[in-house]
Amino acid sequence: MPADSFAALGRRGFVMTSLMTGFTLAAARADAAPIHTDSRGLVVGEVQMPVADGQLPAYFARPAGVTHPPVVIVIEEIFGVHEYIRDVCRRLAHQGYFAVAPELYARLADLSKMTDPQEIFTQVILKAPDATLLSDLSHAVDWAIAEGGDAGRIATLGFCRGGRDVWLFAEHEARLKAAVAFYGPVAGPTSAIQPRNPIDMAAELRCPLLGLYGGQDPSIQPADVYAAAARAKAAGQTVDIVYYPDAGHGFHADYRPSYNRADAEAAWARALAWLRRYDIG
């Protein structure tokens, strides 16, 4: 990212200096019974992770007593690194992974205080430069390796907007060995700070990618997803797209009304199998 762009963000400062507790106010339902994964046998915590213009809050979970565990960079939804994303990290850690989830929007807003998803999207997400996001994710890889993660076994997994960012990161970061995108758009409007969509860069994909999508999700067009996959495959990369016909957007998010338990469990099993298939685990 150009130095002046980082400088501008640095002058603005980091709005979030620590992670939120509990679930996001913007999407959680009152009657939800979300999954809770305990931390027994794990090392978990918050860190201030070094990035190009300062430090970024992040959550991590890793198996205790394991030398050089494989690394999974977990990319949040638009709602921040709240309890659902933390729980995903713990689920991965129980499978033997060193999971790291950076709070990618800490420079722009305290997402724990925002309640309107549309406001989050327009006032935060669309104002976050992709170049900064990708730099932060690469710094998360650096941090995990410095903390003992296996430099030869690195993957990424993300949800919602983070699914879109999984595609971009897999097109950017040469150290990735596998990627898993839970929904997330691959096409849409662009801007000066978000100049390209995943579909535009699909031929540049650097690792095998699994895409998991809901057939009842009106926000993502299957034609776009399959077109992105076709471009990647034409360039010699491996992409597997799976649609769950009865699932909507956010079907894996157990704290949201969109949660579909059967499809969430099936998709999670497929995601873990994908990581193992490419020796990430």
Residue ranges, per PLM feature:
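Short beta-strand/loop motif that positions the catalytic acidic residue
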Residues: 205, 211-213
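N-terminal secretory signal peptides
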Residues: 1-9
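C-terminal catalytic histidine-bearing segment of alpha/beta-hydrolase fold enzymes
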Residues: 236-281
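Primarily recognizes the serine-hydrolase "nucleophile elbow" in alpha/beta-hydrolase
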Residues: 139-200
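N-terminal export leaders
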Residues: 9-24
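Short beta-strand element of the alpha/beta-hydrolase
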Residues: 68-77
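N-terminal cap/lid segment of alpha/beta-hydrolase-fold proteins
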Residues: 33-64
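Gly/Ser-rich "nucleophile elbow"/oxyanion-hole loop immediately N-terminal to the catalytic nucleophile
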Residues: 115-155, 280
